[in-house]
UniProtKB/Swiss-Prot annotation:
AGC kinase which plays a role in TOR complex 1 (TORC1) signaling pathway which mediates temporal control of cell growth in response to nutrients. Required for phosphorylation of ribosomal protein S6 (rps601/rps602) at 'Ser-235' and 'Ser-236'. It comes from the Eukaryota. Belongs to the protein kinase superfamily. AGC Ser/Thr protein kinase family. S6 kinase subfamily. Pfam families: Pkinase (PF00069). One of its GO terms (biological process) is TORC1 signaling. Phosphorylation at Tyr-102 inactivates the enzyme. This is Serine/threonine-protein kinase psk1. ATP binds at residues 97-105, 120. It catalyses: L-seryl-[protein] + ATP = O-phospho-L-seryl-[protein] + ADP + H(+); L-threonyl-[protein] + ATP = O-phospho-L-threonyl-[protein] + ADP + H(+). GO terms for cellular component: cytoplasm; cytosol; nucleoplasm. It comes from Schizosaccharomyces pombe (strain 972 / ATCC 24843) (Fission yeast). Its main location: cytoplasm. The modification Phosphotyrosine is found at residue 102. Residues 351-426 form the AGC-kinase C-terminal domain.
Length: 436
């Protein structure tokens, strides 16, 4: 299964089990860019996105954009000066961790420090040819910069060359939670409680920042060297400005809340629906609403009750049913920080969780990844780690009339370097996998 999901569809991912799917730095203002051809004329312009205003799509539904002062502009402000820009040549590729329609993810070693990172590569041409590719890329880049949480994957650098964007992310040597689930088929309730508790803290943090995650599933839950959760892939995440509802028809179908499938306005409550699906999946080995076609899956999600197996305990059964309320206002967690979050934490399935210690990473994880050589990516699928490292040239013919790298304003300001304190202290304390 994929390590990082590059969503290649503007709407739903069509397959729940689909596989993810010159190095000189180029000055961001130094491109000779041409206009997009008519075939890509529907792409939202950067000027439409940067002011954070609401816009309507072709169906008349409202889209809410990430509030930013400019395309990919750092929240540090105009006075923020990166301590040292990176470029592809600064990193040695070691192995492939995942791939998709937008690009791929590599395990890389920073040449001057020896530190290991996950390098997410995104092909510019693929991004601009998708109607929402620019918006999703901007959202992911902006959110990753803003978020600081022990159970959310960190962004350390962002840069670009002529053909690609690069995100240098925290490497999670424990691999996907999905891989551990696939190996064991079903996870014990105490294990499920621990990891969904860590995910709950991550989601609460995002919701307090006004971010709706929208793609919670085992493939997007990684394990660090100690076995703690790292939530990753924010390509479908959205900042709902001033508490406004979202309307985009996105997500992974089996994990989508009814209100998304029915194209109704929705908010952070969709993430708690996905949490209920995730708990069911981890306990039983599959999501509750499955079928061999999209229409049947949609009918089950919007109309049917989950068929919970007899061996699921009463506590787990109760929280699943409370998360999977069709009416989002009745859903556990929907009340937000005042009541909803406390109600989740006080549920009996989490009775053994000390939430203060959990957030400080003081509770031992139930799964400790076997890591004999962090550079070998032992906990990732051999389907990807066996792939060649060579970068495939991007051909003009591959994208019709679109000239590669012909859209300067769209990617202006993408570069990012985390503060020295964050790079050194955070990395050494939480991600020193080479000493594991």
């Amino acid at each position: 299964m994929p390590v990082f999901m590059f969503d290649e569809h503007d709407n739903l991912n069509e397959n729940y089990n689909s596989h993810l799917s010159s190095d000189d730095e180029i000055a961001e203002e130094g491109y000779d860019f041409e206009e997009l051809e008519a075939s890509a004329s529907t792409i939202t312009s950067s000027s439409d996105l940067k002011d954070g205003k609401n816009a309507k799509d072709e169906k008349g539904t409202v889209e809410f954009k990430v509030a930013a002062h400019g395309d990919f502009i750092s929240s540090k402000g105009d006075n923020y000066v990166p301590s040292g820009k990176m470029r592809p040549a600064d990193f040695q590729p070691l192995t492939v961790l995942g791939r998709g329609s937008y690009g791929k993810v590599l395990l890389v070693k920073q040449k001057n420090t020896g530190r290991l990172f996950a390098q997410k590569q995104l092909k510019k041409a693929s991004i601009v040819l998708r109607a929402k590719g620019l918006e999703q890329t901007k959202n992911e880049r902006q959110i990753l910069e803003e978020v600081r949480h022990p159970f959310i994957c960190r962004l350390y650098y962002a840069f670009q060359d002529h053909d690609r964007l690069y995100l240098i992310l925290q490497y999670a040597p424990g691999g996907e939670l999905f891989s551990h689930l696939a190996e064991q088929r079903m996870l014990p309730e105490d294990v499920v409680a621990f990891y969904t508790a860590e995910l709950t803290l991550a989601l609460i943090h995002l919701h307090k920042l006004g971010i709706v995650y929208r793609d919670l599933k085992p493939e997007n839950c990684l394990l660090d060297a100690e076995g703690h959760i790292l939530l990753t892939d924010f390509g479908l995440s959205k900042v709902a400005e001033n508490g406004a509802d979202c309307r985009s028809f996105v997500g992974t179908e089996e994990y989508c809340a009814p209100e998304i499938l029915l194209e109704q306005p929705y908010d952070h409550a969709v993430d708690w629906w996905s949490m209920g699906i995730l708990i069911f999946d981890l306990l039983t080995g599959s999501p509750p609403f499955t079928a061999n076609n999209h229409k049947r899956i949609m009918e089950k999600i919007t109309r049917a009750k989950p068929n919970i197996p007899f061996y699921v305990t009463s506590d787990a059964r109760d929280i699943i049913n409370k998360f999977l309320k069709k009416n989002p206002k009745q859903r556990l967690g929907a009340d937000g920080p005042e009541k909803g979050y406390d109600a989740i934490k006080k549920h009996r399935i989490y009775r053994r969780i000390d939430w203060n210690k959990l957030e400080k990473r003081m509770l031992p994880p139930p799964i400790v990844p076997c890591i004999t050589n962090p550079e070998a990516a032992e906990n990732f699928s051999v389907e990807f780690t066996k792939l060649p490292l060579s970068t495939t040239p991007i051909l003009h013919e591959e994208f019709g009339n679109l000239t590669i790298g012909s859209h300067s304003s769209a990617f202006q300001g993408f570069t990012y370097v985390a503060s020295p304190n964050f790079l050194n202290c955070e990395f050494l304390s939480n991600n020193a996998v080479s000493n594991h």
